[in-house]
């Protein structure tokens, strides 16, 4: 059963927060040991997965690199993202914070297939607390990406779901494994987590649509839905969630 947790975790600090950049500015000096990984950290990684690392000269398909190595070309990698200047600012704040500076990235996999209406991207973030976080990118600005979103409403499976499952099944680690994503990326994380044979610690679902067929899982699922959500309520099989301000 899903455990829907509001991103109003900010209220625990008794201070108003505007966005995830503010969160890093305020709490980036706390390590993951001092304050454990939470759904805001997951949302940040999910947003960073939209950055077009596949356009970099640095190989993260077969190699492991610190995220800080991308600083000199981050403006270029953010050009094709929504609100490039905010993604760039988020990334700069991220890599220069004590909380995230040691995080590395690898296992980048992308697949854009117009004929099969498939837009897929996944990557793995290696956290210093013996945890690997697999992030699935959500819908991009392409027609194919939006068409694949539409297909979720009437198809039992879409090509990206199969790719997500294969990605997780083929991933080998002795560390704790977390899956997460935003929008369609959250749906992919949930699909892969439910069907994989690999042990999963938990899944973070940030405004992701559900499935045509209701599912059951013993894996802890944290779901966040903003007030203005449309995608996150599609095919939602339960009303047990909290709305967050957006």
Predicted regions and their residues:
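Catalytic center-proximal scaffold of phosphoryl-transfer enzymes
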Residues: 1
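Cationic, low-complexity basic patches in intrinsically disordered or flexible, solvent-exposed regions
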Residues: 4
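Short, positively charged and aromatic/hydrophobic N-terminal segments
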Residues: 7, 12-13
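Alpha/beta hydrolase fold serine-hydrolase catalytic domain that processes acyl esters and thioesters
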Residues: 16-40, 45-57, 63-132, 136-176, ...
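Catalytic cysteine-centered active loop of the rhodanese-like fold, especially the PTP/DSP P-loop
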Residues: 175-178, 191
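Gly/Ala-rich beta-loop-alpha elbow adjacent to hydrolase catalytic centers
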Residues: 181-185, 189
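Short glycine-enriched nucleophile-adjacent loop
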Residues: 189-195
